[in-house]
Amino acid sequence: MDTTIDFQSLPTPSYVVDETLLRRNLEILKSVKDQTGCKILLAQKAFSMYHFYPLIAEYLDGTTASSVHEAQLGFEEFGKETHVFAPAFKKEEMEALLPIVDHIVFNSPNQVKLYAEMVK
């Protein structure tokens, strides 16, 4: 199969991902996980090409998000752990996040106090 890409013919802007290189990088991350026992999460802010989430999910443990919509994307398309963090959360956001996230990072003691009962 010829995988040569005529970059001049692509519409711009275009995002081109070399799946072979992506897999190679994922193998490196898997090696780190295997050697250390750590979990590695996909930062969706940095890479939210959800077309590749099934592939990435073979190697990584979950996603990080900083909004309800990002968390929803990770929950629906990645299907593993969903971690969320933000400077502050509104009550409506917490209500939307609780059914779909596994971990919430609060940025202040006031936020912890405000939502302590909700997150138990």
Identify the role of each PLM range:
Residues 12-20, 24-28:
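An N-cap/entry alpha-helix motif that binds or orients negatively charged groups
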